[in-house]
UniProtKB/Swiss-Prot annotation:
Binding site for UDP-N-acetyl-alpha-D-glucosamine: 11-14, 25, 78, 83-84, 106-108, 141, 155, 170, 227, 316, 334, 349, 360
Enzymatic reactions: alpha-D-glucosamine 1-phosphate + acetyl-CoA = N-acetyl-alpha-D-glucosamine 1-phosphate + CoA + H(+); N-acetyl-alpha-D-glucosamine 1-phosphate + UTP + H(+) = UDP-N-acetyl-alpha-D-glucosamine + diphosphate
UniProt organism field: Paracoccus denitrificans (strain Pd 1222)
Chain spans, region Pyrophosphorylase: 1-229
Highest classification ranks of the organism: Bacteria, Pseudomonadati, Pseudomonadota, Alphaproteobacteria, Rhodobacterales
One Pfam family matching this protein: NTP_transf_3
One Gene Ontology term, aspect cellular component: membrane
Protein name, UniProt field: Bifunctional protein GlmU
């Protein structure tokens, strides 16, 4: 926590025309979540008193996504995109009564780090601009500093040669006291080529009024913004490199790190082992000592210590694997809990199910959980044995230590310790196969 209370404003109103997409730019996915989710996730580390997301293009879709990412975040609507200063002014009414530090972030700039945000929040200056030393300053606005801090921000088109030689440039991210923003935002003009109101005018206005204005710097990589599909692909590659490095540093073994793909919130314990070509979607936790074998896809699931998954397995949202559970190849599990020591070896679908401790699920077992309208649950007790190719037609319960015969279709509850058979009686016709084949060949010959 910082000494001053903190509020976040995340600007997410732009259309992103260079993305060539009907989807709002901030909803394109990076690390398995919408771009705007990265700013919200990092900002959460400051424990902000309020979060406001400014939406414009595709506002309804943005609001829906934000509600899932941070249910406490508020939405401010910027109906006309008239610049960053105008966007922040639309958010301020949502911060009525807030007195503290406001940090303005961008929904399309996903890599601003926790330490950088903490520096912006804790800095004693009245206004703090986030800058970076650019390898190629290009057309960035230059930050002109002096003994008393930031003197001015000079846009490239307005800069002389000496100013253009400055490599310290503006990221666009800004932190300022809420009272100062309320005072100076109405003073911003739009006398520029675009006719827009720019947040970058705030430092100059504040300095002219005697306020302290400073610069905090970060690594250039943190400021990577995304405006095109190519930049999105580059950002995904950069995100994965960082995520893999972090996992290795945390004690995770990966047999081929370059083939493992992480989501923003992937959490893997030390001494877990991850095989090649594993994909983690959002919402996955893997405890210490678990093993994910090659070619698995996991999303919205929990894998306990000692469990093994794969190869070629899929864990979907709501899958909960207890300790020492084994999930083998070509198994799909959704919204199901497998208690400690349960085994599902191969070729199985478990949906909306609870599998008890040390139960064995035979190959080809399917929980028939959907009747075309509603989902239904399957309950399987501890130490049960489900024979291969069993169809469990939910809602149904198989008791503890019970068994089902291979090929059974189970439509009624099976008591504890019982054996259930639900298949037609086998009939053997001696010699019929030979006679039938002879007749068929004769018919074909005619």
């Amino acid at each position: 926590m910082t000494e001053k209370p903190v509020a976040l404003i995340v600007l997410a109103a732009g259309q992103g025309s260079r993305m060539q997409s009907d989807l709002p730019k901030v909803l394109h996915r990076l690390g398995g979540v919408p771009l705007v989710g990265h700013a919200l996730s990092t900002g959460r580390t400051l424990e902000p008193e309020a979060v406001v997301v400014v939406a414009g293009h595709g506002a309804e879709a943005v609001a829906k996504a934000v509600a899932k990412l941070n249910p406490e975040a508020k939405i401010a609507l910027q109906e006309q995109q008239l610049g960053t200063g105008h966007a922040v002014s639309q958010a301020l009414p949502q911060l009525e009564g807030f007195e503290g530090r406001v940090i303005v972030l961008y929904g399309d700039t996903p890599f601003i780090g926790q330490e950088t945000l903490a520096s912006l929040a804790a800095h004693p200056a009245d206004v703090v601009v986030l800058g970076f030393e650019a390898s190629d300053p290009g057309r960035y606005g230059r930050l002109v500093t002096g003994p008393e801090g930031l003197e001015r921000i000079v846009e490239y088109k307005d800069a002389d040669e000496a100013t253009r030689a400055i490599r310290l440039v503006n990221s666009g991210v800004l932190a300022a006291d809420a009272a100062l923003l309320r005072e100076f935002l109405p003073m911003i003009g739009n006398r520029n080529a675009a006719g827009e109101y720019y947040l970058t005018d705030i430092p100059e206005l504040a300095r002219a009024a005697g306020h302290r204005v400073e610069v905090v710097t970060c690594d250039e990589a943190e400021t990577l913004g995304i405006n095109t599909r190519a930049e999105l692909a580059a950002a995904e590659a950069a995100f994965q490199v960082r995520a893999r490095a972090r996992a290795l540093e945390d004690g995770v073994t990966m047999t081929d790190p370059a083939t493992v793909w992480f989501a923003l919130d992937t959490c893997i314990g030390r001494d877990a082992v991850i095989g090649q070509n594993v994909v983690f979607g959002p919402g996955v936790t893997v405890e210490s000592g678990a093993e994910i074998l090659p070619f698995c896809h996991l999303e919205g699931c929990h894998v306990s210590a000692g469990a093994t998954v794969g190869p070629f397995a899929r864990l979907r949202p709501g899958a909960e694997l207890g300790g020492d559970v084994h999930v083998g190849n070509f198994v799909e599990i959704k919204n199901s809990v497998l208690d400690e020591g349960a085994k599902v070896g191969h070729l199985t679908y478990l949906g909306d199910a609870h599998v008890g401790e040390a139960t064995n699920i035979g190959a080809g077992t399917v929980t028939c959980n959907y009747d075309g309208v509603s989902k239904h649950r399957t309950e399987i007790g501890a130490h049960a044995f489900i024979g291969s190719d069993t169809m469990l037609v939910a809602p149904v319960r198989v008791g503890a230590r019970a068994m089902t015969g291979s090929g059974s279709v189970i439509t009624e509850d099976v008591p504890d310790d019982a054996l259930a058979l639900g298949r037609a009686k086998q009939v053997v016709k001696p010699g019929l196969a030979t006679r039938l084949m002879q007749a068929l060949r004769q018919k074909k010959g005619n």
